[in-house]
């Protein structure tokens, strides 16, 4: 196990790197991002070989198909990670942006300027793409990053960080700007949670257990990237063909991600027509349905849903289904079980759609669209560092701006108070 002194050394290197990063030009940072993207593709074979070992170990451990999908890399996914870095190059550099500026009666000029957070710590699970996204976003915003990924992806992460850190340093980025903690034990994660001397913020990405452990135990400031117990509500006035497409996309495209749908609510006025149809379609797509008693009466052969099912982020091809008597009952169900991530309504009633967006308390609320769009790249932010479900500092997909803070820069000509 890594000892605290080794982790502290990484922290010191990151702190030193952050000091230098904060004053680098956009040109240097963009050049480094391009070099990192090129290195990912150039070292694809080494990265895929490392990932193959992680995948085999995951199968031996009995990881679910959804979790293995999160872990898996292939040529296309590596190219997508590289494209994410290239996309960051084309985005404006937020560092140095003057958010607002004003002049006081005494002539003092005050400006509110974006600056880096400093050193960002990321604790995450078996998703190698997070390694690239986090490194790229932090570099673009002048932040150093210390990455602690899950043991399931350790070989993949080591290969990725070896490629991108070397490429970035050769392009002018200071050593220590991108570091990986290779010990993925819980003890090391606990140590990171108390590294206030070195870390300016800690961002957990993963399941409920990991996130709650960090929120509960960290003394470092935390931005909580929440669990995604996302709902789709099919209203009485819904276009049912549209609803079918949205549900299939939200549940089946990538069930192991936080913006996938976990619960389906259907208004009783359309349930008799819609439930048997959507039940058949989803069952044929290998989705395990768990329904309320009324759902079971319309589509037999499925499990009865429990309260725990309605509260669960399955991250798998499982969907909890409930028939509701009214729009208000749907909202109450969402209020009770939502994790505040992403919620959707399918309806042709504009006033009801507006009411849904006002009353549902979530980071992203959708009208006639899939919850799968809650994603930094899909929102046009480039990659994302995570999806925040808290309300302080950042909420929703966290792109470049969310990795900055502000500094007040004041110009005078001898003013005293």
UniProtKB/Swiss-Prot annotation:
Localization per Swiss-Prot or TrEMBL: Cytoplasm
One example of a Gene Ontology biological process annotation: L-proline biosynthetic process
Pathway: Amino-acid biosynthesis; L-proline biosynthesis; L-glutamate 5-semialdehyde from L-glutamate: step 2/2
Enzymatic reactions: L-glutamate 5-semialdehyde + phosphate + NADP(+) = L-glutamyl 5-phosphate + NADPH + H(+)
Entry-linked Pfam families: Aldedh
This enzyme's EC code(s): 1.2.1.41
SS bond list: none
Annotated family: Belongs to the gamma-glutamyl phosphate reductase family.
Protein name, per record: Gamma-glutamyl phosphate reductase
The species this protein was found in: Heliobacterium modesticaldum (strain ATCC 51547 / Ice1)
Lineage: Bacteria, Bacillati, Bacillota, Clostridia, Eubacteriales
């Amino acid at each position: 196990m890594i000892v605290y002194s080794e982790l502290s050394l990484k922290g010191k290197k990151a702190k030193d790197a952050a000091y230098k990063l904060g004053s680098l030009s956009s040109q240097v940072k963009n050049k480094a991002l391009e070099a990192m993207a090129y290195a990912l593709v150039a070292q694809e074979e080494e990265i895929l070989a490392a990932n193959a070992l992680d995948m085999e170990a995951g199968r031996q451990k009995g990881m679910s198909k959804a979790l293995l999908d999160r872990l898996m890399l292939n040529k296309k996914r590596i190219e997508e990670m590289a494209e994410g870095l290239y996309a960051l190059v084309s985005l404006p550099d937020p560092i140095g942006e003057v958010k607002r500026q004003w002049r006081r009666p005494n002539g003092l000029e005050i400006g509110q300027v974006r600056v880096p957070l400093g050193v960002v710590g990321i604790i995450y699970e078996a998703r190698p793409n997070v390694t690239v996204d986090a490194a790229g976003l932090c570099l673009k915003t002048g932040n150093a990053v210390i990455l602690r990924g899950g043991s399931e992806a350790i070989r993949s992460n080591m290969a990725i960080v070896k490629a991108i850190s070397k490429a970035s340093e050769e392009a002018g980025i200071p050593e220590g700007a991108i570091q990986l903690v290779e010990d993925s034990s819980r003890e090391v994660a606990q140590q990171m949670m108390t590294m206030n001397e070195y870390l300016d913020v800690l961002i957990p990405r993963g399941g409920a257990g990991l996130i709650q452990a960090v929120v509960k135990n960290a003394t470092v400031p935390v931005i909580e990237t929440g669990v995604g117990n996302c709902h789709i509500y099919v209203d009485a006035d819904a276009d049912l063909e549209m609803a079918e497409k949205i549900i299939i996309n939200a549940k089946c495209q990538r069930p192991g991600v936080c913006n996938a749908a976990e619960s389906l609510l259907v208004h009783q006025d359309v349930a008799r027509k819609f439930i048997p149809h959507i039940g058949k379609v989803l069952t044929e797509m290998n989705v395990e349905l768990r329904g309320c008693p009324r759902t079971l009466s319309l589509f037999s052969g499925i499990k009865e849903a429990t309260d725990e099912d309605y509260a669960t982020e399955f991250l798998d091809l499982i969907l909890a289904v409930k028939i509701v008597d009214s729009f208000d009952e749907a909202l109450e169900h969402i209020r009770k079980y939502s994790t505040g991530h992403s919620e959707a309504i399918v309806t042709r009633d504009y006033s009801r759609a507006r009411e849904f967006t006002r009353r549902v308390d979530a980071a992203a609320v959708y009208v006639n669209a899939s919850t799968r769009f809650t994603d930094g790249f899909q929102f046009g932010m480039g990659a994302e560092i995570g999806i925040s479900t808290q309300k302080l500092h950042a909420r929703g997909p966290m792109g470049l701006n969310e990795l900055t803070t502000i500094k007040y820069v004041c110009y005078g000509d001898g003013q005293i108070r």
